[in-house]
A protein has these predicted regions:
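Alpha-helical transmembrane segments of multi-pass membrane proteins predominantly involved
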Residues: 1-277
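Single conserved hydrophobic/aromatic residue that forms the stacking wall/gate
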Residues: 276-284
Length: 284
């Protein structure tokens, strides 16, 4: 058992790419630990769960801060260009952890006055924080879509978390429908851009046609070569990607759903929705 543990921890070295996302892995493990603690602890010890969630995130935050202070990250690519880390992304990771800690604290106060499941709330907040930390590091449309959809699916549950409230259930249903619509629009735009940029004769077989930088270079260098249908596909694909992201963050003119969803969602959920989705996605 000890040998397996040493071998596992030994994998998180500076040369191993998994060490780059160690804070996100720690949040995922912590979320699973909370669910396991709920089953293992007696009812009179359930109050330890929110403390475990908060202090666990504090430990992860210290790891991120230590990386900011002592590690010279520079501009580093991991997982074949799926994510890029630099000083700004490290600061954004710390921002998500701080806001997630505050949301868990607000959630503890809110849930103490409600007869609602508590552990699942903290686990979902941790998953959202981990996904958003990956989102701001994404350099590829695959990572962008997977991380963004992980956040969105978790929000589907959190918006309708107050299941005894008609307004909360209504908000959850509206968010589910509009979220699915925005995901479809975003994915369709990504497919169109990949379809035109994935041509090896234009892009080159060694380049990643879903990478932001490579795609931008392709469009810039081939502006004069893309005529007729190809040029129209690029424009439509770009428009759909922008529209899908604007739907997600509630930007004008796609903000109609925001008042209804925020009105019915629990207060901590509204806080986590704005801090974890709107502001960082706008920055991205």
């Amino acid at each position: 058992m000890n040998e397996l543990l040493v071998e596992f921890l030994g994998g998180f070295t500076k040369t191993n790419q998994w060490s780059a996302i160690l804070p996100e892995i720690m949040l995922g493990v912590l979320a699973l630990a909370l669910l396991g603690a709920e089953m293992a602890l007696p009812k009179n010890k359930q109050t330890l769960i929110p403390r475990l969630a908060i202090w666990g995130q504090v430990i992860v935050l210290l790891v991120v801060i230590g990386c900011i202070v002592w590690c010279n990250v520079g501009e580093s690519e991991y997982f074949s260009g799926l994510i890029i880390q630099n000083d700004i992304t490290q600061i954004m990771r710390a921002f998500f952890l701080v806001s997630s800690i505050l949301v868990c604290y607000l959630g503890q106060i809110y849930l103490s006055k409600q007869s609602l499941p508590k552990t699942e709330f903290y686990a979902l907040v941790l998953i959202i924080a981990a996904a958003m930390m990956l989102l701001v590091q994404s350099a590829n449309f695959v990572m962008l879509f997977v991380a963004l959809e992980t956040v969105t699916v978790a929000f589907y549950v959190l918006v309708a978390y107050s299941r005894t409230s008609q307004f909360s259930l209504e908000s959850g249903l509206k968010y589910l429908i509009l979220g699915a619509l925005s995901s479809g629009i975003l994915l369709f735009g990504i497919v169109l851009l990949y379809g035109i940029a994935g041509n090896p004769e234009l892009m080159g077989s060694s380049r990643d046609s879903l990478n932001y930088n490579e795609l931008a270079k392709f469009i810039t260098l081939n502006t004069n070569n893309l005529v007729g249908v190809d040029n129209m596909i690029v424009k439509i694909g770009t428009l759909l990607v922008v529209a899908g992201i604007c739907f997600k963050i509630g930007a004008v003119p796609f903000q109609i759903w925001v008042p209804d969803v925020y009105q019915g969602a629990p207060t901590p959920v509204t806080a986590v929705s704005y801090t974890h989705l709107t502001l960082p996605t706008t920055w991205l």
